[in-house]
Amino acid sequence: MTPQEVITQARVLINDDNSLMPERFSDTEMLGFVNQAIKRAAMVRPDLFIISDDITPTVDQVEQELSTNVTRIMEVHRVVGGGAIGEVDKETMDRSAPNWTTETSGAPVNWMRHPRNPRRYFLYPAPSTGTEISVEYIEVPDDYAIGDTMGLADSYRSAIVDCVVYLAEAVDNESVDTERAKQFYTSFLQSLGADMTQRDVVDSESGKAEQRRGNNG
């Protein structure tokens, strides 16, 4: 699925396919709508944007931070070429081993979520030089060029098209149909599964990311 394919389908739905009159929106404007739609999809269904990667943490630092295009750390699995890294609660670690932040660097055996910043996490012990860790995180894609292949599965194409139509009609003051725009946005949400059966990535009171199902009340 490319932005161009999405734009072509969206133009038909907004009667902007250049068949009878000049296009109301340029390809650049439509591409902007596509990239906005992807970012909205990431907010509604962050689980569709989980990345598995091996990364090099900052040496000799217990507190780590992922890049700015990452919205949250999901899991720290293991040291690459080494053992598993188990998740523990930071408050529990602080109570049971008050000096854990000053211990000698080495291969991490535990990790903890930051209580207030989903992009940050802690490693125990602090990683030594040459350490790589296997992690999962949610990353919002950079803006796509019109011919790029998007990372979202093609089965979600109709959802992105619906959101592009919504965004186009919402800014077209001359011909906007508010109810029609709302219908396309509702279709976008439903196509993503953002209804009563949606599986959301949420935070528990402990700060740990979890998945749960919505209910009818």
Residue spans for each PLM region:
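Glycine-enriched, solvent-exposed interface loops adjoining structured elements
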Residues: 1-217
